[in-house]
Structure formats: C-alpha cells, structure tokens
C-alpha cells in the first residue's frame, strides 16, 4: 500500500501525520506551501480540488477531511490504538463525534484567531476578539476534563489528544491567546509532545521547512 500525505508544518495535517507515525507504517510526504498559496495552484488542485491540507492518497485514491482520514487510519491499523474501542455502538461513535467537533467547531475558532482576514474584507479586530472569547470557553472545558485525567479518554492516549492539543496550541501560538490561564493544558501539551511519535512528526516538519528554505517558527 502506497500512502502519501499532503501537509504543511504546524497545520492540522500535523494531527494526521501523528496518526501515521503512531501506526508505524511507511508513507511519503509532500509539503504544500500554504504561505505562498500553493494549495490553490493548478497543480495541487489536480490532486485535491478542495485546495486544502491534509489530503491522503492511498494507492491512487484520495481521501480528504481530517476526521475521516483519522477514522480510516484507525480502521486500517487498529493495533495502533488511535481511537478507543467499545462494544456499545453509540459509545463507539464518541471519538468520531469528538473528531468532527474538532474539525467543524473548534478549527473555525482557531481560524478566527489566527486568520481573521479570511472572515471579512473589512475590520478584523472584532472577529479575532470573538474567536479569543470562544476559545477561552472551550479551553476552560478542556482544562476541566484534563485536570482529572491524564488523557482525553482517561489513562490511554488517543489521536483526539493530538487534535485537541493542536487546537489550543495553535490558538496560543505567537501569544494571540493566553494559554497560561489553563495549567492543565500546559501539562497535557508536555505529555503529547513527549511521545516518540510526535517527536518524529516535529522532525519531519522541520526537515520539510529546511528543504524548502523556510524558517522554523518560534512556537513550533
């Protein structure tokens, strides 16, 4: 099986790459430079007409939407333990609900904070402030849950931990959001980043940026 991940360092494709690393499989990567607008280039639109990352090509077939990609990887590589299992069909869907929440609800708030200009052609300060307020509410909920639990689902890591980490850490990058208000999230972040699979993700991303001659962000 030939797998290629189309990604950009620090984007939500970082979560997808972490899942691939946890699965311990061989895969190729192709960086799509979001800063230069490569995602909207004719060449990339031939790969993914949605013009976004991540995109995962498996034996010539393309899969998009992070929550769907992660769900498929969990099916293909169950031994990796990307998501918790349950014999109860309703409980078994909870991780998929959480991933959809990350993608459809939380990610747009991240975008409000980091890229408010995408929401309007006018003044952006109100949009960013609204995103910061919303993320504060969400982070309070994250912190309450993680204060009494090592990982999102208890004592065992899942890819949802990386997705939640990506949400709050990306919001805070560049001091745009006051993450220090939530010490439980700082502790959770340290646990996520300490995992060998995540360290391999960081190395791959650094290598991709260096190969492209791009700087490594301070909050990487």
What are these regions (language model features)?
Residues 33, 159, 205:
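Short, solvent-exposed turn/loop segments enriched in Gly/Ser/Thr/Pro and often Arg
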Residues 68, 184, 197:
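Residue-level recognition of oxygen-bearing side chains
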Residues 87, 200-208:
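Short, flexible loop/turn segments with low-complexity composition
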Residues 205-220:
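Acidic/histidine-enriched, glycine/proline-rich intrinsically disordered or flexible terminal extensions
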């Amino acid at each position: 099986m030939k797998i290629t991940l189309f990604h950009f360092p620090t984007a939500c494709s970082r979560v997808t790459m972490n899942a691939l690393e946890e699965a311990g499989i061989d895969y190729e990567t192709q960086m799509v430079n979001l800063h230069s607008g490569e995602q909207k280039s004719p060449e990339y639109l031939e790969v993914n007409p949605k013009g976004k990352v991540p995109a995962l090509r498996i034996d010539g077939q393309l899969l998009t939407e992070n929550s769907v990609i992660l769900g498929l990887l969990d099916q293909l590589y169950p031994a990796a333990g990307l998501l918790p299992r349950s014999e109860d069909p309703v409980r078994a869907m909870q991780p998929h609900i959480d991933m959809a929440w990350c993608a459809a609800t939380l990610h747009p708030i991240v975008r409000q904070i980091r890229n408010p200009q995408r929401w309007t052609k006018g003044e952006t300060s109100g949009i960013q402030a609204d995103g910061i307020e919303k993320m504060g509410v969400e982070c309070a909920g994250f912190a309450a849950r993680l204060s009494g639990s090592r990982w999102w689902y208890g004592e065992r890591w899942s890819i949802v931990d990386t997705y939640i980490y990506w949400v709050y850490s990306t919001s805070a990058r560049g001091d745009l959001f006051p993450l220090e208000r939530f010490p439980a999230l700082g502790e959770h972040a340290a646990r996520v980043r300490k995992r060998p699979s995540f360290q391999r993700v960081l190395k791959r991303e650094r290598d991709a940026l260096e190969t492209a001659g791009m700087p490594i962000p301070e909050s990487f």
